[in-house]
């Protein structure tokens, strides 16, 4: 049985890069469902909101204490790769020389 995903951050990054969420059109649903599953598996309460079913937003809440709340925000859509040269396919999540390669690997 593999180690929990939080113990394998490079594996998580590779999996996220493999989702082709180019915007337009976005199509982030599969990626959001994947992240939702990981959070749910970890016991974190989630909620999905969507004006467009293919572009949902995922909310996750962790119970806190007396400190002020903290909001972390991110995105899973990426810009197109048309006309660009890549050393590795942009949605492969390839690993080479100690790095994970792919569209979106650095801008989260």
Mark where each language-model region is.
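Acidic/His- and Gly-rich active-site-bordering loop/insert found
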Residues: 2-107
């Amino acid at each position: 049985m593999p180690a929990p995903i939080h113990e394998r951050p490079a594996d998580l990054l590779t999996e996220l890069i493999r989702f082709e969420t180019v915007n337009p059109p976005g199509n982030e649903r599969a990626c959001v469902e994947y992240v939702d599953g990981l959070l749910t598996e970890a016991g974190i309460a989630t909620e999905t909101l969507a004006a467009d079913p293919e572009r949902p937003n995922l909310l996750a809440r962790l119970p806190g204490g007396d400190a002020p709340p903290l909001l972390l925000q991110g995105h899973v859509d990426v810009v197109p790769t048309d006309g660009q040269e890549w050393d590795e396919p942009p949605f492969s999540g390839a690993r080479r020389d100690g790095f994970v390669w792919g569209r979106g690997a650095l801008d989260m």
